[in-house]
Amino acid sequence: MAGARGYRSYRGRGSKGKIILAVILVLVIVASLAFIRMQEYVVYDESGRPRLSLPGESAEQTPPEEEEDVNLVIQEKTSKTVRAMQLSTAPLTVWDGAVLTGGTYTDQTCDAVAVTMKDAAGHVYFDAAGAVSGAVRTEAGTAAALEALNAADTHTIAILSCFHDPLAANADVEGMGLKNTGGYIFYDGSNSQWLDPAKPAARQYLCALAEELAKLGFDEILLTDVSYPTEGKLDKIAYGTTPRAENLAAFLDEMAAALEPYDVTLSVELPAQVITQGSDDAAGLSLADTAQRADRIYAAAAPADAAALADQVEAAAEGTDFAVMLTAADTPPQEGSWLLPAQS
């Protein structure tokens, strides 16, 4: 039945209002998301004012902080040329600089003196705290003579025999001695004994002696017998697992580290054939490995061969000096470093 005249039943709000509300809600959501998204592209200038930096726009790069200048100091080998005279192997009891005037050898004046501080028998010719028992051989005036020597205006060279050392090898066979494959001390072709370069205690023994010499004031330390034995039943030597050349290189590295606090030249004697051939596998010697770790290389050779040997040393390690070790009958070369033998 129809309703009363003039009235209609109420049907609620129209659908148009709902649509408007939905549109407004969507716009609010989109605006919020856009605001959040745009925060990623807001940057601030030096005054703190914000600005918009959109993708693809060339953003102003912040200038990098100025780096302080770094002065890189590279210490080059600066070994000067030396013309040295070697004194007799014995405890030094007196020092007289007049011995360097040349004597019977040459009309050239020597400017350096070499003194044996440890020989190939293991004898130590100074009051070394670290020497094995019975190795030290000194006289009453030795300490005073060494002090006077190193106080003089003369380049002083301490000769230190290294691994050929029967005294130290027998004093501590297990810790320092070179052994044979049977587990006993090795005897070379001259019935002598050696320290084992593979054993840290043997290397440390030599480094400690060298450091004592540096403390005495020597300007240069010349290492001799830096090798394995090359005579005798070499196939009976218990070399261990580390290559011989690596053991000797490790020794020279440790020696350099021990002497680093002191202003001292580190020198090594090599056989001349190691310089000409480049290596000696039996001895464990490599010219390159040795020359790169030393300031000066010494080798016994004729004066006429000195220049060629010096060139080969220089080629192996730029800046490493070469000194020829002469005989009593030799006339020293006019150029380069050399070492005269002890006067008889």
Segments predicted by a language model, with ranges:
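Glycine-rich, aromatic-flanked loop segments that form ligand/cofactor-binding clefts
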Residues: 112, 138-186
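N-terminal Lys/Arg-rich, disordered targeting/topogenic segments
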Residues: 1-17
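Aromatic-lined carbohydrate-recognition surfaces of secreted/lumenal glycan-active proteins
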Residues: 155-164, 222-223, 245-283, 317-330
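Active-site-adjacent "subsite" loops/lids of carbohydrate-active enzymes
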Residues: 73-92, 163-211
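Hydrophobic membrane-insertion alpha-helices, especially the h-region
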Residues: 20-37
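Catalytic domains of carbohydrate-active enzymes, especially glycoside hydrolases
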Residues: 98-124, 212-222, 288-298
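Substrate-binding cleft of secreted/luminal carbohydrate-active enzymes
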Residues: 37-43, 293-344
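Aromatic-lined substrate-binding rim segments of carbohydrate-active enzymes
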Residues: 68, 102, 119-161, 231-266
